[in-house]
């Protein structure tokens, strides 16, 4: 589970660990999908499709202090979940961070 998570989290890439049935995950997907990401730099990882979902959530707990989804990573930094993403978006920090990372098309 640790290797799986670590293989997904990469500098310059936005990765969101999700469960498809979770409304907060869907909201997060909606927000991020509207932004002009460069190809391959936005990934949604469905942890229900893995055999070790609870181990993945345990590792996310270790890594980020919470095992709930969505867990949003901007590069190697976990910014939290859906409400954290919305707060960043409202302050204009989200676009700034994504531009800084080089994740968006010009």
Swiss-Prot record:
Domain Glutaredoxin stretches: 2-105
Keywords on record: Acetylation, Cytoplasm, Disulfide bond, Electron transport, Redox-active center, Transport
Residues with PTM N-acetylalanine: 1
A molecular-function term among this protein's GO annotations: ATPase binding
InterPro entries named in the record: GLR_AS, GLRX1, Glutaredoxin, Glutaredoxin_euk/vir, Glutaredoxin_subgr, Thioredoxin-like_sf
Subcellular location: Cytoplasm
Regions crossing the membrane: none
SUPFAM superfamilies the record matches: Thioredoxin-like (SSF52833)
Gene Ontology cellular-component annotations: mitochondrion
Disulphide bond pairs: 22-25, 78-82
Modified residues (N6-succinyllysine): 8
Record NCBIfam families: GRX_euk
PANTHER family in the cross-refs: GLUTAREDOXIN-1 (PTHR46185:SF1)
Family note: Belongs to the glutaredoxin family.
Purpose: Has a glutathione-disulfide oxidoreductase activity in the presence of NADPH and glutathione reductase. Reduces low molecular weight disulfides and proteins.
Name the UniProt record assigns to this protein: Glutaredoxin-1
Organism expressing this protein natively: Oryctolagus cuniculus
């Amino acid at each position: 589970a640790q290797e799986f998570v670590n293989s997904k989290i990469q500098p310059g890439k936005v990765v969101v660990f999700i469960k498809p049935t979770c409304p907060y995950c869907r909201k997060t997907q909606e927000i991020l999908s509207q932004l002009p990401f460069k190809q391959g730099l936005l990934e949604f990882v469905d942890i229900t499709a893995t055999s070790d979902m609870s181990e993945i959530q345990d590792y996310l707990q270790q890594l980020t202090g919470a095992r709930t989804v969505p867990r949003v990573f901007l590069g190697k930094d976990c910014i939290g979940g859906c409400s954290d993403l919305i707060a960043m978006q409202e302050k204009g920090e989200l676009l700034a961070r994504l531009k800084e990372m080089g994740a968006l098309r010009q």
